[in-house]
Amino acid sequence: MVLIRVLANLLILQLSYAQKSSELIIGGDECNINEHRFLVALYTFRSRRFHCGGTLINQEWVLSAARCDRKNIRIKLGMHSTNVTNEDVQTRVPKEKFFCLSSKTYTKWNKDIMLIRLKRPVNNSTHIAPVSLPSNPPSLGSVCRVMGWGTISATKETHPDVPHCANINILDYSVCRAAYARLPATSRTLCAGILEGGKDTCHGDSGGPLICNGQVQGIVSWGGHPCGQPRKPGLYTKVFDHLDWIKSIIAGNKDATCPP
């Protein structure tokens, strides 16, 4: 079993180097305007600055991270450039917010998830459409897509006008345990990144999606500081492990409990 895991990690390392390019998610490529119709931006009424991302999973519900909770949250949908407003941009406020734990007591490696019910549903449009929840967990080595308006510099807060995207790999959880000594032996998180560094989510990307094969498999949670260091992958809340809770809440069971 140990040998298989070592071989798998070596294969992923080779794949990571094969995919290396000039793009970084901290400085990466501008997303195609049509590839992120489900991506939303969270900001507060006072700041007007995006502090987190989120994912539209149906016309009335948005998935994000517990760490992204704020008073007076606003949710922007259909946005690409912050300088040029699409005709179908919509803004919503939460009607209800649900957490596995209090947004103040989640841990970095457990239950960093928030489900937001919008006060008014949104309509599908050219730049707005939900993404599917996962039918199965992602496979080790899967190439997945991360995106957001987070900082594009590992050393200073430099936020782009448009969302940036990059491809990263699903890694064995043991890679993240080796990188972060305090991680428990098991957790309901995904370990994902590029082993040699360079591609990573960063400040301002929290709450945004990890998309694998057209499904939202992860929620950006946390990672190394500064972002994008070699062998310091990111941690993503594992959406598949929370499916029953998500579906129960949406169905109207407000007392649904998260997996232990």
From Swiss-Prot:
Residues 25-251 form the Peptidase S1 domain. Disulfide bonds join 31-165, 52-68, 100-258, 144-212, 176-191, 202-227. The keyword Secreted applies. Pfam families: Trypsin. Glycans are attached at residues 83, 123-124. The keyword Lipid biosynthesis does not apply. Its main location: secreted. One of its GO terms (cellular component) is extracellular region. Belongs to the peptidase S1 family. Snake venom subfamily. Snake venom serine protease homolog that may act in the hemostasis system of the prey. This is Snake venom serine protease homolog 2A. It comes from Craspedocephalus gramineus. The gene is TLG2A.
